[in-house]
From Swiss-Prot:
Belongs to the RuvA family. Residues 146-160 are annotated as: Flexible linker. It comes from the Bacteria. Keywords: Cytoplasm, DNA damage, DNA recombination, DNA repair, DNA-binding. One of its GO terms (cellular component) is Holliday junction helicase complex. GO terms for biological process: DNA recombination; DNA repair. This is Holliday junction branch migration complex subunit RuvA. Homotetramer. Forms an RuvA(8)-RuvB(12)-Holliday junction (HJ) complex. HJ DNA is sandwiched between 2 RuvA tetramers; dsDNA enters through RuvA and exits via RuvB. An RuvB hexamer assembles on each DNA strand where it exits the tetramer. Each RuvB hexamer is contacted by two RuvA subunits (via domain III) on 2 adjacent RuvB subunits; this complex drives branch migration. In the full resolvosome a probable DNA-RuvA(4)-RuvB(12)-RuvC(2) complex forms which resolves the HJ. It comes from Bartonella bacilliformis (strain ATCC 35685 / KC583 / Herrer 020/F12,63). GO terms for molecular function: ATP binding; four-way junction DNA binding; four-way junction helicase activity. The keyword DNA-binding applies. Has three domains with a flexible linker between the domains II and III and assumes an 'L' shape. Domain III is highly mobile and contacts RuvB. Residues 1-64 are annotated as: Domain I. Its main location: cytoplasm.
Length: 217
């Protein structure tokens, strides 16, 4: 099995490249998004590799990050989704947006991918929404958040609950693949929007995702 390849970009085609690794040219299939961001020919390229072995062919699929490779594999666990469809989805939606679409059950967002209709989009959401989604977020200590408003010391318990909801929401957002600083900023804005209230972690996540989505468009 090949886990990773590092070599020189030899040739670029419509859906794949030839990567020269010490004189051996590997045909590696890539998403359109990755193809459009490649360096000039002759430059070094390093890719995580997923190998598909069939009776008539061996195909290599390349990814810029491990989390993209994990998404590629996870998507193919969904009935009716093969390598071609999985690449089409990753060509249209980077991991954070794909995770967001599944979390919010956003059929339209997934259906933007070429060759992916409403039925397949619904199936992806239904089969993956309760599963652990691939993430590159490291485990870190929780930051200090904007405090929920409090007028008396008797509300200390409410503040503690609110802070716990904030921590739960941040953990969920980073697990979805958002950068920690980006998720923290959106969450702080969400907390301000609920000033005087103690929203659940689910409400904070939904509000934060709307803010993050507006920045991604």
């Amino acid at each position: 099995m090949i886990g990773k390849l590092t070599g020189i970009l030899d040739s670029v085609f419509e859906d794949h490249i030839i990567l020269d690794v010490q004189g051996v040219g590997y045909v590696v299939f890539l998403s359109n998004r990755l193809l459009s961001s490649l360096p000039e020919r002759g430059q070094a390229v390093s890719l995580f590799i997923e190998t598909h072995v069939r009776e008539d062919a061996i195909r290599l699929f390349g990814f810029e990050t491990k989390v993209e490779q994990d998404w590629f594999c996870l998507l193919q666990n969904v009935r009716g989704v093969g390598a071609k469809v999985a690449l089409a989805i990753l060509s249209t939606l980077p991991p954070p947006q794909l995770a967001q679409a599944i979390t919010l059950s956003d059929i339209a967002m997934i259906s933007r991918s070429p060759g992916v209709g409403k039925m397949v989009s619904e199936r992806i959401i239904n089969e993956l929404k309760n599963k652990a989604l691939p993430s590159n977020a490291p485990h870190q200590s929780m930051p200090h958040f904007v405090s929920y408003s409090s007028e008396t010391s008797s509300q200390a318990g409410t503040q503690h609950t609110g802070h716990q909801h904030s921590m739960d929401a941040l953990a969920a957002l980073t697990k979805l693949g958002f950068e920690r600083d980006q998720a923290t900023h959106a969450l702080q804005e969400a907390i301000k929007a609920f000033e005087g209230e103690t929203p659940s972690s689910a409400l904070l996540i939904r509000h934060s995702l709307k803010l993050l989505s507006s920045h991604l468009k």
